[in-house]
Regions:
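Structural preference for solvent-exposed beta-strand-turn elements
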Residues: 1-368
Length: 368
């Protein structure tokens, strides 16, 4: 095998693979990429047995073939090549040779036949979707995905087609919940919702971030999801299980509703939480007519408070929250103001854009 390719093009392919390959894999070959050269160009594949990606790139191929070498090592080398072009050649005993200008590398490889086969996506029914819309939905839910591996059902986002072309995405870690509903026209042919794993979702976000406006397709088979855009395809295994009945934890309507500038609340929470307890990030919200006071107390550091003007008429209330959870929600909203609904000190808080129920965030209270 031998081909010549633009270094930036090869770097792009290898960068896509970095989040998928296993750095400390029990199977060493899962730390590799499979580079295949044919008459139509070069493909670079990465697969960790759960998520696989294949990207296609133009190249001058003088001899077809395949190699598999360390993804990280190859990426690091290509990132610092002295010339705009690089020649890749397969040597005996699965070694790979890279040449760019006066720079020359000889890398240890493995037999390409040992690289695991990626699942075929023939059974997946792919639907053309809006890249910007899908990217927005991921950004507005990913922060609430659980990192607790013992609660594997919550280690992903729930993708649920609704009526009239609407799709709902929901994530929760048991302490907070994020829900967003948008129009993604097309029939995904799903009998019920599916759970997209956290790692797969983050890789999907990275691919969408490359070119949000590019045409893309999303589809599902029995236990896998497929994402495609020009020159690239990604397949991932879905989480097998039943997502919790999330509707039950969303309060119908809070007794106390206030309107506050999003940026003011965001900045105040960041300032005051500097003196909150390290692990809990606890802050206290005290609500009275047209006033919201935010306080934090740390026996080792001291205390802090800040007052914000809000649109509110009603009784007083004091309730505690994890400041980090509130900050995460405010950070994904674009509106100038945010609506906050509260019940009592034991009830969850609900945050939404004013007059818009297509996004809902629920944050559980805490003792402070």
């Amino acid at each position: 095998m031998e081909f010549r390719i633009a270094a930036d093009e090869l770097k792009k392919a290898l960068h896509r693979a970095q989040g998928i390959v296993e750095r400390k894999a029990t199977m060493p070959i899962l730390s590799n990429v499979l580079v295949t050269a044919s008459k139509s160009g070069v493909t670079v594949a990465a697969f960790d047995l759960d998520i696989g990606i294949v990207s296609e790139h133009l190249a001058e191929v003088s001899k077809p073939g395949a190699i598999t070498v360390s993804a990280k090592t190859l990426f690091d080398i290509v990132s610092f090549l002295p010339e705009a072009q690089v020649t890749v050649k397969k040597l005996p005993n699965n070694f790979a040779e890279l040449t760019s200008g006066a720079a020359h590398y000889k890398l240890v490889g493995m037999a390409p036949e040992e690289f695991p086969r990626l699942p075929k996506d023939d059974a997946a029914h792919a639907v053309k979707v809006s890249g910007p819309t899908l990217l927005e939905m991921i950004k507005k839910t990913q922060f609430a995905i659980s990192n607790d591996e013992t609660r594997y059902i919550l280690n992903g986002v729930f993708f649920e087609p609704r009526e009239k072309g609407l799709v709902r995405m929901v994530a929760t870690d048991g302490h907070r919940l994020a829900l967003v509903e948008r129009e993604l026209s097309g029939d995904f042919k799903l009998k019920s919702g599916v759970i997209i794993p956290r790692k797969g979702l983050f890789e999907l976000k990275r691919l969408l971030d490359e070119a949000p406006d590019a045409d893309c397709q999303l589809g599902f088979a029995e236990n896998s999801a497929i994402f495609k855009k020009p020159g690239l395809s990604m397949v991932m295994r879905l989480i097998d299980g039943q997502f919790p009945e999330y509707q039950r934890v969303i309060p119908k309507e809070g007794e106390k509703q206030l309107l506050v500038r999003r940026d003011k609340l965001f900045d105040a929470l960041k300032r005051i939480s500097l003196l909150s307890a390290d692990k809990s990030n606890a802050v206290k919200l005290s609500l009275s007519e047209n006033l919201l006071r935010i306080t934090a107390n740390n026996p080792d550091l001291g205390e802090a408070k800040d007052d914000l003007e809000v649109a509110y008429r009603g009784g007083t209330l004091t309730v505690g929250f994890n400041a980090r959870y509130l900050i995460d929600v405010l950070g994904v909203l674009e509106t100038d103001e945010v609506s906050v609904e509260l019940g009592d000190e034991h009830s969850p808080g609900v945050l939404r854009p004013p007059g818009d129920r297509s996004f809902t965030a629920v944050v559980m209270p805490m003792r402070v």
